[in-house]
């Protein structure tokens, strides 16, 4: 009887999966953490070639799983995974902060190039306030900012932080971001949940001096929130003024506030919250348009007693204020309890978020977990949820101009040359499939293949499994993922 019941549940889940519309636009990302060598490089001091080989292997795995973006930590602790005039080389590359890779190369330029080759977006992940990861054992270079400006920093627990209350700190962070978006072809600037640090029981964050100087007329909590507001506004202005195409996203802790603290809060019992403990008023940032997307870290399982995934998913849908909402999934928790031993946990989370029109995708923490194919989730993504490619959803407030449609030249029965001659820059061509007799567009045609190209591409029909009673179409796709009109291919 139990076997029959289990089979019925499995069939029901399978039916539910295939009954859903497969999205042509869906963010599918993975966090790649470099701090403490969590994901990449696997250890410090590896030769440059080995570092590159490891990153290529990571990208290939995620591309196979259907991902279209990676979120890579490029500034773990006031250091850099790239040559910088402002901050030293990261110790997580070579084992010693300030020491360049050997043989020399630019890891960030390399990672961006390899990511874009695969038609994926590269989101540069920065930590705004962490300066020294561990004051007892971290390598700190002589030219590190903590030694140039020791008056900017505060020790809390075993870490050293920028003091968020200092205007000079905000200016320094803006300089770092401006340099990054000026020199590199990144697609977004991304920051996670670490604004003010998570509270340590019995210890107050030691910012009394800066509060006394700058906090006039505000409570300390209000002042701290205003400091986070100020850095977000300043960074958004910096990005817009430097390269308006680049997106700005935040990945906050999953609970903004509990309902017991605020009528707008969620039906949760979070021990710490964004608003009250990290001083990050995410809702204000969304309302004001200071950020382009939000990725709440909903790392709990469905049915969690204190922070239910289902409850929080609906809550964030209600409060995304027209900006893009992607959901952060805690796949690193695979196998940690019964809920995370259940192979349906992540598939069900994806199915549920797809039932909300305002949720536009997923980001998974962390990259290395996928190398183990936990609970067969790689197989589920490849064969079901992400079987077909998807484009990162475009952001019309940044750019809503579609590129010109491509032209087609037939070479043989199975080969076509696709050309683009428009003024708008493009990054790829999309091949779509649609039923005969249907006026094809991106809402009713299925994206089946992406060809990374800026001018010309060859379409080989023999490599595509075309169905009967369907026609193929091609379209141009620009840097903001706007799609041209579809042109009949075959």
How should these model regions be labeled?
Residues 22-29, 67-78, 107-154, 190-193, ...:
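Glycine-rich, aromatic-flanked loop segments that form ligand/cofactor-binding clefts
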Residues 25, 33, 37-53, 124, ...:
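Active-site-adjacent "subsite" loops/lids of carbohydrate-active enzymes
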Residues 53-79, 183-187, 284:
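Catalytic domains of carbohydrate-active enzymes, especially glycoside hydrolases
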């Amino acid at each position: 009887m139990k076997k029959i019941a289990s089979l019925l549940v499995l069939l029901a889940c399978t039916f539910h999966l295939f009954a859903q519309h497969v999205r042509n636009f869906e963010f599918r990302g993975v966090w790649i953490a470099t701090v403490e060598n969590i994901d990449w490089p696997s250890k410090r001091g590896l030769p440059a070639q080995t570092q590159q080989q490891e990153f290529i292997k990571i990208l290939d795995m995620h591309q196979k799983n259907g991902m279209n973006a990676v979120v890579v930590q490029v500034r773990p602790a006031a250091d850099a995974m790239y040559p910088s005039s402002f901050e030293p080389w990261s110790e997580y590359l070579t084992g010693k902060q300030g020491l360049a890779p050997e043989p020399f190369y630019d890891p960030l330029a390399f990672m961006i190039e390899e990511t874009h080759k695969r038609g994926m977006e590269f989101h540069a992940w920065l930590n705004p306030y962490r300066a020294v990861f561990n004051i007892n054992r971290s390598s700190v270079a002589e030219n590190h900012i903590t030694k140039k400006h020791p008056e900017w920093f505060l020790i809390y627990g075993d870490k050293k932080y920028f003091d968020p209350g200092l205007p000079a700190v905000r200016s320094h962070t803006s300089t770092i971001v401006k340099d990054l978006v000026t020199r590199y072809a990144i697609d977004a600037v991304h920051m996670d949940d670490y604004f003010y640090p998570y509270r340590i029981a019995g210890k107050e964050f030691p910012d009394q001096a800066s509060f006394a100087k700058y906090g006039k007329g505000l409570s300390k909590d209000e002042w701290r929130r205003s400091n986070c507001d100020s850095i977000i506004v300043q960074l958004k202005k910096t990005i817009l003024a430097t390269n308006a195409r680049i997106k700005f996203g935040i990945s906050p802790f999953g609970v903004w506030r509990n309902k017991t603290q605020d009528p707008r809060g969620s039906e949760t019992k979070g021990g710490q919250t964004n608003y009250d403990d990290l001083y990050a008023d995410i809702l204000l940032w969304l309302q004001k348009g200071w950020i382009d997307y939000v990725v709440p870290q909903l790392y709990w399982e469905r049915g969690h007693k204190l922070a239910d995934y289902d409850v929080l998913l609906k809550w964030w849908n209600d409060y995304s204020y027209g900006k893009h909402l992607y959901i952060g999934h805690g796949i690193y928790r695979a196998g940690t309890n019964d809920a995370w031993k259940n192979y349906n946990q992540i598939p069900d989370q994806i199915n549920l978020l797809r039932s909300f029109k305002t949720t536009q995708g997923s980001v998974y923490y962390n990259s290395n977990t996928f190398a183990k194919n936990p609970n067969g989730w790689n197989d589920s993504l490849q064969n079901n949820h992400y079987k077909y490619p998807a484009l990162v959803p475009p952001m019309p407030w940044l750019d809503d101009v579609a590129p010109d449609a491509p032209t087609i030249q037939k070479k043989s029965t199975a080969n076509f040359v696709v050309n683009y001659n428009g003024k708008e820059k493009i990054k790829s061509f999309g091949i779509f499939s649609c039923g005969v007799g249907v006026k094809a567009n991106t809402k009713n045609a299925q994206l089946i293949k992406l060809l990374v190209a800026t001018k010309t591409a060859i379409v080989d029909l023999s490599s595509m499994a075309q169905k009967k009673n369907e026609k193929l179409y091609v379209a141009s796709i620009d840097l903001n993922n706007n799609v041209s009109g579809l042109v009949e291919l075959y």
